[in-house]
């Protein structure tokens, strides 16, 4: 049957779907309005069941008579169970993923709207606060975030009755806050848990503030690198702590794949080496990590102490990875299916790194092209940036994000160990590091990264 006012044929307009952001949404409603809507639906279903009213047109009918000819007893009231699924809200706060033609979206005020999808996740699926093991030097973390407005009304008859479950699913196009659901907005690929919180505003995330990172973000917003980093929207207070209000880089992606690439030939500051020599602090946890990778790595003295210093561990870690050879290393990957991996500690050669990127992109030539263009854009911007020229960039990462709709983006993140140089000093970022020259090898790593992706594009 054709409903009045509804066109025949396909119900969805041509091109509509998760990758077509042009559909209009229903008006936004508050959580209170949603609750009232739900309660009204509960009351209506219960009243209909109590009155013995027939099911809605189109529902599967059961026999109205039992074998002995007596009328079938009215079923017990059916109470819907509310399930709010958690998807990504897609209103970027600043430069977001590129559009389908590869153009980068404009800054604040732009909107990338996508149709919502039903999901099988529920309020009881709270998830974990940490996806992967903590890293000793990175601060990328997960967070709770604003939920998408996907609602399922699941109605079930009394469990004592021998009947099938009936599910009534409705999709409500309005964003709601779900305090019971955690969305991995900033994926915990490598870092300390608890660094991030939900901002309560679409497209934003809160990161625990540190003086060095706050200093850097303020200056980056006035530098040519502004479009290459998460947009910074000031400091807010939550639970007695200060948080940086940042752009949620995963906003606007549908089932994103994420890769964290630690840049530079070292991830420790020169002053850390100095302090370690003056007041060496032994770390048993880092000794255990070293032992797990290579039992022969610790010296006899370290075996006896069953501990190593942090700089010693980090120098060893960089030596077994591609940091010292290529100027970057892969910290972790999250795929669209939610599976994560940080097993890249010994990924050292160019060939090994190339295979990892190839698997990460799964042969998507368009994503590869966009990644390559974005990296070249970032390199061009870094080379003219006054901020970059006058800062030692340590422990910072490039965050790669793409989805099945061929959206792809790369951003510089994590500036907690980025420090200004003395007046008059500038860095080349490609020269070999020697203690005292403060070179970080950032551009050396970026050159190699671009070369690896370019070689994949030529295949």
UniProtKB/Swiss-Prot annotation:
InterPro entries: IPK, IPK_sf. The modification Phosphoserine is found at residues 135, 195. One of its GO terms (biological process) is inositol phosphate biosynthetic process. Activated by calcium/calmodulin. ATP binds at residues 195, 207, 247-249, 260, 334, 414. It comes from the Eukaryota. Its EC number is 2.7.1.127. One of its GO terms (cellular component) is postsynaptic actin cytoskeleton. Pfam families: IPK. One of its GO terms (molecular function) is calmodulin binding. It catalyses: 1D-myo-inositol 1,4,5-trisphosphate + ATP = 1D-myo-inositol 1,3,4,5-tetrakisphosphate + ADP + H(+). Residues 1-29, 49-164 are annotated as: Disordered. The modification Omega-N-methylarginine is found at residues 35, 55, 62. Keywords: ATP-binding, Calmodulin-binding, Cytoplasm, Cytoskeleton, Kinase, Methylation, Nucleotide-binding, Phosphoprotein, Transferase. The keyword Ion transport does not apply. Residues 116-132 have a biased composition (Low complexity). Residues 285-293 are annotated as: Calmodulin-binding. The keyword Transmembrane helix does not apply. Substrate binds at residues 262, 283, 310-317, 417. Its main location: cytoplasm. It is an enzyme of class 2 (transferase). It is found in: Cytoplasm, Cytoskeleton. Catalyzes the phosphorylation of 1D-myo-inositol 1,4,5-trisphosphate (InsP3) into 1D-myo-inositol 1,3,4,5-tetrakisphosphate and participates to the regulation of calcium homeostasis. Belongs to the inositol phosphokinase (IPK) family. This is Inositol-trisphosphate 3-kinase A. It comes from Mus musculus. The lineage of its organism: Eukaryota, Metazoa, Chordata, Craniata, Vertebrata.
């Amino acid at each position: 049957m054709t409903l009045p006012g509804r066109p025949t044929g396909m119900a969805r307009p041509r091109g509509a779907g998760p990758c077509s952001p042009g559909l209009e949404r229903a008006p936004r409603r508050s959580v209170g309005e949603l609750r009232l809507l739900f309660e009204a639906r509960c009351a209506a279903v219960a009243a209909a069941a109590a009155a013995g009213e027939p099911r809605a047109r189109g529902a599967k009918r059961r026999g109205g008579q039992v074998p002995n000819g007596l009328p079938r007893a009215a079923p017990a009231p059916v109470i819907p169970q509310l399930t709010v699924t958690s998807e990504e809200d897609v209103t970027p706060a600043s430069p977001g993923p590129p559009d389908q033609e590869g153009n980068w979206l404009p800054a604040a005020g732009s909107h990338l709207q996508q149709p919502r999808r039903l999901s099988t996740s529920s309020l009881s699926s709270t998830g974990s606060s940490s996806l992967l093991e903590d890293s000793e030097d990175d601060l990328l973390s997960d967070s709770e975030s604003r939920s998408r407005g996907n609602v399922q009304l699941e109605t079930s008859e009394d469990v004592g009755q021998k009947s099938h479950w009936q599910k009534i699913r409705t999709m409500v196009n309005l964003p709601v806050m779900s305090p019971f659901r955690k969305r991995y907005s900033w994926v915990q690929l490598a870092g300390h848990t608890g660094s991030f919180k939900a901002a309560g505003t679409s497209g934003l995330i809160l990161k625990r503030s540190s003086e060095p990172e706050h200093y850097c973000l303020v200056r980056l917003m006035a530098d040519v690198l502004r479009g290459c980093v998460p947009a910074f929207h000031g400091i807010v207070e939550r639970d007695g702590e200060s948080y940086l209000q940042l752009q949620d880089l995963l906003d606007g992606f549908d089932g994103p794949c994420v890769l964290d690439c630690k840049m530079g030939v070292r991830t420790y500051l020169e002053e850390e080496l100095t302090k370690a020599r003056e007041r060496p602090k032994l770390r048993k946890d880092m000794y255990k990590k070293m032992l797990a990778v290579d039992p022969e790595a610790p010296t006899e003295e370290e075996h006896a102490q069953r501990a190593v210093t942090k700089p010693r561990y980090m120098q060893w870690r960089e030596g077994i990875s591609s940091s010292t050879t290529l100027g970057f290393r892969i910290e972790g990957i999250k795929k669209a299916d939610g599976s994560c991996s940080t097993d890249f500690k010994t990924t050292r050669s160019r060939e090994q790194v190339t295979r990892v990127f190839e698997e990460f992109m799964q042969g998507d030539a368009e994503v590869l092209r966009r990644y390559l263009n974005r990296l070249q854009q970032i390199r061009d911007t870094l080379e003219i940036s006054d901020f970059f020229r006058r800062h030692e960039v340590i422990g910072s990462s490039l965050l790669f994000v793409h989805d099945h709709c061929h959206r792809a983006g790369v951003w510089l993140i994590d500036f907690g160990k980025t420090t200004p140089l003395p007046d008059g000093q500038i860095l080349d970022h490609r020269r070999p590091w020697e203690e005292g020259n403060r070179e970080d090898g950032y551009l050396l790593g970026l050159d190699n990264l671009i070369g690896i992706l370019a070689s994949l594009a030529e295949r």
